[in-house]
Amino acid sequence: MKKLKINYLFIGILALLLAVALWPSIPWFGKADNRIAAIQARGELRVSTIHTPLTYNEINGKPFGLDYELAKQFADYLGVKLKVTVRQNISQLFDDLDNGNADLLAAGLVYNSERVKNYQPGPTYYSVSQQLVYKVGQYRPRTLGNLTAEQLTVAPGHVVVNDLQTLKETKFPELSWKVDDKKGSAELMEDVIEGKLDYTIADSVAISLFQRVHPELAVALDITDEQPVTWFSPLDGDNTLSAALLDFFNEMNEDGTLARIEEKYLGHGDDFDYVDTRTFLRAVDAVLPQLKPLFEKYAEEIDWRLLAAIAYQESHWDAQATSPTGVRGMMMLTKNTAQSLGITDRTDAEQSISGGVRYLQDMMSKVPESVPENERIWFALAAYNMGYAHMQDARALTAKTKGNPDSWADVKQRLPLLSQKPYYSKLTYGYARGHEAYAYVENIRKYQISLVGYLQEKEKQATEAAMQLAQDYPAVSPTELGKEKFPFLSFLSQSSSNYLTHSPSLLFSRKGSEEKQN
């Protein structure tokens, strides 16, 4: 998958061109009859989206996601509340615009010529390619030429339908496919890994995130080159909403907010390791249930799943782990660090986890307050790995090379330079294995994404099984619900205590239509 980046140049060019076209609509505040005035009079910005790990999701009842966060900030920018409507597929999103039920579509939608004929695009903010996926171990097609409608299914409203039609007309006359009117791309990817479907097509970012939980999903081939992603609004003579979006994105670009949000949601990297991910998820099943109580007990200010990811990166959850350099235990502490923390046995899992958390908290306390709250943990983890003094050097080097020392996106790019003599020779604390610190933090982020998604998949499976049980035995009395007669209850009880988070929604769940007020 190609590297993702916010298309700042495209935003700038688009802003310049549209500013001229939209000049009669600027300033857009204060006009009596326009879309912005209607939104402000209503007191809410109506945004339709789809439920995916990237666009919109909930953890512990709190919404998050790249498109959600941008939409929330845009609503704040306009001085109104955000009303989010979650749809099942892309086709339903555009129905909302057509029926006047949404002001904006914020759902990772690709900019293409067919869509802009009928809808107004906004600035682009990252890019994706469309890819054909299959299940590992099944036949991998090397071309689209021989695929049939029995093999290939795509989601309704998917942008790739236009590309498939063009390929059929120009290159692959035998190519055929079908459109599932009810399922979105995430559901179709689930069908592929469950063996219900041979192939489907999804965007590269969605696939990358899906693979963190389902490593058996594999990419067969690219269907398109990179395509810009944008928001859409109604296309008519009123350009006030478009003008407001341009102003908003330009402001976000200039003050660095856009880059920070990109790093938050897209900064986990796009390199997927099938073996490593599969090994990690097997450890989640086999080892994590025994360690979870300790992670929950000592996590304190950080998410216990992040703490678990840190411990896995350190030792693969092996309390007896020892490195050639002498660091030992679950959190791989040095002898001196362990002594300073009062740890008497580094191979005792509880002592190691407790000490590791305290050491990490010490690193967190040293991170300057100028660093945004949601990025402080990454600075602290890099310091945990290579020492805080070298983190100071990394921030200083970032400032010297015209980057932002308070931005993790900028600082992490300079970390590998700490091992290069032209750079470390001029730094206060000298040489450091900055490339290792970079990989260390990136790996932890990937493990955290996999863990959160996988645990929520377990919750979904348990919930669906419980619902099926209720349907199968609607009139069973409590006295009949013995574990011998209904062994699933034993599994459900164990799952609830060993695996499940208490999040009411699922990172990779199948969602229908719902509305959220923010």
Swiss-Prot record:
Disulfide-linked positions: none
A Pfam family recorded for this sequence: SBP_bac_3
EC id: 4.2.2.n1
Region annotation (Non-LT domain) ranges: 22-269
Cell compartments where the protein resides: Cell outer membrane
Notes on the domains: The N-terminal domain does not have lytic activity and probably modulates enzymatic activity. The C-terminal domain is the catalytic active domain.
HAMAP family: MltF
Name of the molecule in the record: Membrane-bound lytic murein transglycosylase F
Organism this protein belongs to: Escherichia coli O157:H7
Encoding gene, per UniProt annotation: mltF
